[in-house]
């Protein structure tokens, strides 16, 4: 199979490089999406022995309208058939439930806002999948459709942002070790998303125009609140202003996140302006949702944060203050900061400029230029 876009846009490998790659077996994670589809094709063009693997990480329930696993598997199989590669199938639902979903529920129950995609990458895609591919399928590498890059210079393996800044997914991969990165290939991390779709179109792949998946994988397109209340009992309570004034009722603290504006159910309040309300705190002890008005309200701002559960790509804890940049949520622009080590599993982070909606349970991920250094889970804000 050939793609004119691929031949025009991607660098050519030498015959020697292709011959070297031909001795290496790569198991490419096939999600049924366009990114993994094109990743498999690129690996083929680079000479690797390529096989696909479809992971089932969630058992379907009665809400068949929301579960796309069967459709995704069919698309992954169609792509592999078109490319002429074998597709393996594996069920990691038990591992996902134990290592990702139960943690997700525990964090929400504790009033924090976790990121299950980060935990899924840590526990499933770059642990269970990697181990299975290497030990059971004889892989030299795994590959995924993540928009990140790998750098190998002077024996040092580093994780870099994806070339397409709009699609960079390094934020979700900060828990990886340099050894895991060294065993992984990220073919689409070197190109931009429109080129990925153009290559898929050239090849006539069924996934060429398929919409990117959004939201949490096990929830799909259903309403988050409806899903969560099936597993955790809601505890309604009061909504109060920062000064303690009661202005409404909330449905349960777990349904709200810091900085949230929509869905608060607060109408016009007598004696107050028309400025929108934002969540600024969750008082777990008293079951109170605290709000303030205006997107520039000082109650929304944090001077820094404390983070724990640290993972550095090189697995070397920092011993002295570090100047770098940080993201406290996906798609946020980098913020200049200073990282102050407290111990091997706790850091203080001081922003150069105050930041809004720093949310416990989410991750703070650190960078120096293009290099992702690692990160940790936000324990609390520093006001």
UniProtKB/Swiss-Prot annotation:
One of its GO terms (molecular function) is tRNA-uridine 2-sulfurtransferase activity. Gene3D superfamilies: Adenine nucleotide alpha hydrolases-like domains, HUPs, Translation factors. Disulfide bonds join 120-217. One of its GO terms (biological process) is tRNA wobble position uridine thiolation. Signal peptide: none annotated. InterPro entries: MnmA-like, MnmA-like_C, MnmA-like_central, MnmA-like_central_sf, Rossmann-like_a/b/a_fold. The record marks 146, 362 as: Interaction with tRNA. Keywords: ATP-binding, Cytoplasm, Disulfide bond, Nucleotide-binding, RNA-binding, Transferase, tRNA processing, tRNA-binding. ATP binds at residues 29-36, 55, 145. It comes from the Bacteria. One of its GO terms (cellular component) is cytoplasm. It is found in: Cytoplasm. Residues 115-117 are annotated as: Interaction with target base in tRNA. It holds the Pfam family tRNA_Me_trans_M. The active site is at 120 (nucleophile), 217 (cysteine persulfide intermediate). Residues 167-169, 329-330 are annotated as: Interaction with tRNA. It is an enzyme of class 2 (transferase). The keyword DNA-binding does not apply. Catalyzes the 2-thiolation of uridine at the wobble position (U34) of tRNA, leading to the formation of s(2)U34. This is tRNA-specific 2-thiouridylase MnmA. The gene is mnmA.
């Amino acid at each position: 199979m050939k793609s004119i876009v691929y031949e025009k846009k991607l660098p050519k490998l030498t015959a020697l490089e292709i011959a070297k790659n031909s001795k290496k077996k790569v198991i490419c994670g096939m999600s049924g999406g366009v990114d993994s589809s094109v990743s498999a094709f690129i690996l083929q063009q680079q000479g690797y022995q390529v096989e696909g693997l479809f992971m089932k990480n969630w058992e379907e329930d009665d809400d068949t309208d929301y579960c796309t696993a069967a459709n995704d598997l069919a698309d992954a199989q169609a792509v592999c058939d078109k490319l002429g590669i074998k597709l393996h199938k594996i069920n990691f639902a038990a591992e996902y439930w134990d290592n990702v979903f139960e943690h997700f529920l525990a964090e929400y129950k504790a009033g924090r806002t976790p990121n299950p995609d980060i935990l899924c990458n840590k526990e499933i895609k770059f642990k269970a999948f990697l181990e299975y591919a290497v030990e059971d399928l004889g892989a030299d590498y795994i590959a995924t459709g993540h928009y990140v890059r790998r750098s190998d210079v002077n024996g040092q393996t580093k994780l870099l942002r994806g070339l397409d800044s709009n699609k960079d997914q390094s934020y979700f991969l900060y828990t990886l070790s340099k050894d895991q990165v060294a065993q992984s290939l990220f073919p689409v991390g070197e190109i931009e998303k429109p080129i990925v779709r153009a290559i898929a179109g050239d090849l006539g792949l069924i996934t060429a125009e398929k919409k990117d998946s959004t939201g949490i994988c096990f929830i799909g397109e259903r309403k988050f609140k409806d899903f969560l209340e099936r597993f955790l009992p809601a505890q309604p309570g009061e909504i109060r202003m920062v000064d303690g004034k009661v202005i409404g009722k909330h449905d349960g603290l777990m349904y709200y996140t810091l900085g949230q504006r929509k869905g608060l159910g607060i109408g016009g309040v007598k004696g107050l302006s028309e400025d929108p309300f934002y969540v600024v705190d969750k008082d777990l002890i008293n079951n109170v949702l605290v709000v303030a008005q205006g997107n520039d309200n000082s109650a929304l701002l944090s001077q820094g944060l404390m983070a724990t559960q640290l993972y550095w790509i090189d697995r070397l804890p920092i011993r002295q203050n570090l100047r770098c940049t940080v993201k406290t949520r996906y798609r946020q622009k980098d913020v200049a900061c200073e990282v102050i080590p407290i111990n091997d599993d706790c850091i203080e982070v001081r922003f150069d400029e105050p930041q809004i909606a720093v949310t416990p349970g989410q991750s703070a991920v650190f960078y120096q230029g293009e290099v992702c250094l690692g990160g940790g889970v936000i324990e609390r804000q520093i006001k």
